[in-house]
């Protein structure tokens, strides 16, 4: 029976059993194993080498180095046993220890060799020969020594006299040399003494010459003032002659209707009034006849003309207000504190007067303590010149003239008025001058009273051929006064130019607009652009009347100085002229050589650092000298000796105003008064709104205080401060200022990220596990598993209908399978043993095996039946089709109207299911707020190579494409990977921003508009973030803003009230812009130069402002900023003594006071500070270089732009000295003897020579212990007559 037949019988048996359900049938089955079919020799099995496993295992022996044959193994074991046995023996003997004895084999002994007689003889001969050789050497050596001693003895005897002669000659030569050296030293000492005496005589002569030059300068200043007074007197005398005064009008008019001057004239001479009254009475009695009609008409015309003339001339002298110059009033107030009888006259001289010396015409109530009053009205007294006697008795006496008796009283009155005019200065009150200049008809504007006086002052300068400085405070209209001057020259003098106006780059457009507005009749050339454009503008450069005014910048005039230098200018006007304060700079040297008839300097701060800068301006005005006799204004050394050094001592040492200091101040005023006009806004513009300054102290935040204390307490910082290195100290100061402004400027808040590891630890550890995991991932075992069979895929049944699924469940035959399986289990004998090849149990065992196989097959069929019949979908295809057939939402009008009438129609559509199913993007959007608030935990470390380890089977192209897709979880993953600092910490990390927040809320809510100034560009970025956080609208202006954009931003801020804040850089927003739309100025930090802050605040507090201006200065408490503010207040002391706007000297503040900005307690640091006080200090150039090195790159660039435009451009206005090779022969007072006599050496050379003389004097005192005797006097007189060694 074959295998197929047996299978058929089995199937038939099974079916029969199912049908009959009987088990009595017995079947005997015999199986025969078929023979293998051999088709190849390889199919024949070989005979086994070993019969069984034990024989195979006994065929080899496994050792450490591999498997061996049993015989080889025995030999190896035997050798190993012998080796270990020897090792044990050596160990017992101690050979393996360090103390083991080492036994050396002895050399074979030669005792067995016999010694013969000949050997003894030869050894004796060798010993005797060695002994004789040694004796011979000893005797030869002894003989050489003896012979040498004998030769030396006889040589000494033969050369004794010659040696003695040589020694004597050597001694004489040495003595002569020393004597000559002493004589030469003595002559050098005498020569130094002669030079010292010559230097003293030269210094005395120079001092005398300097006094004479100062006297000449003072005399010239006095002459200029007297010349102006004479011209004013002539005009007044011509206008107030006897014929011009209508005494009838004065007598008949009530005193209430007359002005002060008319009352003065009316009651100045009672005798003249009585004579006029008597003449009128005589005329009334004599003139009784009536006049003809023609005579009446002529008389009416004469009366009308006389009345008009009287009104015009009376209006010219209606009121005379006594206004003294600001410097004079400040001096008077200062002197009044010391003594009541110290008075300053117009020329600044101090006159000590007694009370009884003052004329009786002056009221006793007019005491000198009234010097603080701005107006001194003329009193109704018998002599109007008494007030001038109060100020200057000598000047008043000089002005008395001989007049006839009839006009004595009237001329006394006129002289009093003219003398009083000598002390008048404009201050904004209505002043009408006798020689008032009419506004030119070309000028399209209106001048205020003080501007009218400024025009008259400028005109007087031009008429006297004198150059001057218009130093009005910023915002008083220096530009419009200059334009009016040029219009006056064109109208009255027929002088149409050409005029050159040099201005900072930032205000070029402003000057052009002012000219077009107020003087449209002039042709204006605005010189700017690239080199090609400037070349085109120079076409017709030397043709007359091509244009009248050329406006250019400091930078361009230096670049194209050749064409400007060759052209002849009528007026050269420099705006912001304090930028030529350094006479060593190339800018000063170039502009000095320009061919200009007149020069005018416009500046709001004539003094910024020291009086040397003022000398630079004055010398620039008068390079040819104040008079024809003098070749220059004054050399620098003399000017410093006259004014600078006394003022420095006065300010630095805090001395009181003694008579010597008062005299120095008065002389300085006399020198400056003819050339300088200075008015303050508070003095000339009474309607100007008030200005209030507030200092707001801000506490440092916790982070600021930590960074500040940490930096100042570092060992490195203490070393730098103790070393005294200027650049390093400035750098430390800048770092502390950054901490005070905002801690992020010093140290940014870190952005926390996870530490990224390129290689994970799992890549190096558990290699076997990693290989297995890689193999499984590579083979993709999930593809070999039928998950649907295991019913793990629940969505495979969604294609079934729910009704079909129910039918399939009803066809499940689980119960039938259970009955058959129960029957088969009953037939199986569990206790049946395996077949033992016996006929008795083979049948039972075979039958039991058949039943077991049938049972297993039945169970498998049961499982398949249940699996196939139990497929039930989650939703079913019928439900899905129903959902797809639901009506969609309609947006038509009919649907909307119908739904309005029948709300139930809206039930056909629903968004409930749609809202339950959210996409990844929608879920990320809904959880955005939660993610932003709570996704804040950043892991300490992440591994980069994990995706590569577990995604080897994914192609790289696919990974790249997936990475380019927009990841909705990118924000969440980023927040978990990177922790950014909260933006609100920007405010809470800084004490100034917290104060600024409260301040802005109050100001903006009350309708104020704010200007915020800062020095650092990075602070502007922080302020922008701060304003954006709080939602304030703002504008920004810094050094990078173009000139055209500045004007647009300025006009937009002034015209748009919806922009409450304007943030600016002090170095760019402090010049050339008008921001009167703001009434509040906030200085976030203070600049190094207080004048820049003053310029910045005057952008708002100027003419045109209608509201009071409040200035807030934010200062960090207990920091270097507090010390800087204290120093700035001390620097403003000089303003009260010289002129408004002065400061301390640079040498006093620059280096020595830098250490004062730190709160130093250590003794070492105090010692360094004392050394720096005694040593030389840094000049302004080193100061600026140090600041440039310490500041940030953006701030350095902004500073360069600031210097370029007078606080806008560092490149142009940095005080760099000009190399000597660049200076022309006549371009500098340092290089031309004819230009500046006595100026051959600058201050540095003078100081070095002085130091040399001091050293010579000290050496002289050391060399000469005794006093100078008659021989010394003879030597001194000889050298004085014959000259020193360098003169031979």
Curated annotation (Swiss-Prot):
Keywords: Activator, ATP-binding, Chromatin regulator, DNA-binding, Helicase, Hydrolase, Nucleotide-binding, Nucleus, Transcription, Transcription regulation. Residues 105-177 form the HSA domain. Pfam families: Helicase_C, HSA, SNF2-rel_dom. It comes from Schizosaccharomyces pombe (strain 972 / ATCC 24843) (Fission yeast). This is Helicase swr1. PANTHER family: HELICASE SRCAP, HELICASE SRCAP-RELATED. Belongs to the SNF2/RAD54 helicase family. SWR1 subfamily. The gene is swr1. Its EC number is 3.6.4.12. The lineage of its organism: Eukaryota, Fungi, Dikarya, Ascomycota, Taphrinomycotina.
